[in-house]
Amino acid sequence: MSKPQVIVHATGELLAAAVAARLVTRLVDAQAARGSASLVLTGGRTGIAVLEQLRTAPAMGAVDWSRVDLYWGDERFLPTGHPDRNETQAREALLDHVAVDPGRVRVMAASDGEFGDDPEAAAADYARVLADAARPEDHGSVPSFDVCLLGVGEEGHTASVFPASPAVYETERSVVAVRNCPKPPPTRVSLTLPAIRRSAEVWLMTTGESKAAAVAMALGGAGEVQIPAAGARGQRRTLWLLDRAAAAKVPKTLVPPLA
């Protein structure tokens, strides 16, 4: 498992543009190596800003989007097309503007879908989706995602794994239903930390002074039960991509000069 690497940008806007450029390079490299790439998307202000920047990135055309397998790290369990669904926001920001293969866009079920208002069934279904997508070389029931994009909440949650919640203790399942979330909407579906840790690279992105304490705790050695984002690690690389405000309380020994 990789150790966290911190990269700080002056502003959130610069961070989103830099992450978009970095992501183009990573996807192109993956496609050159094996013909396809896999990416886990996230929601939230920063996650969607990255997708918007990606849409207009100068090297955007270098990515063959028909050969990108897309997943979600978590989803708000709401009806199809609801504006608060991560899928809806990702489609508006990027996916409706590029030539994706619909069969490779693996969304989490909506609350008006085939499983009705049953997030546990939706979670079990997405676990099956992941298992079906896993290759023999992945050595398990979760694909080895090239990049898993994640946000970080003010209290240290990532995906929809919240501090001291049942999800943070999960060690067997790759996807779980999350009820009674402290942030609305209260019901969600989320990858677990063990599933996230199957990723080759995990990129945690966050901005703003309200995140500074959680970021500092995660990078300062807090456990994942207290700060779930601390448990999100990639097999080969773990990046903490921050703006100056979010990095304000990180020990100076961990923070390089501004990118």
Roles of regions detected by a PLM:
Residues 1-39, 120:
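N-terminal glycine-/serine-/threonine-rich phosphate-binding loop
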Residues 31-58:
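Glycine-rich N-terminal segment of FAD-binding domains in flavoprotein oxidoreductases
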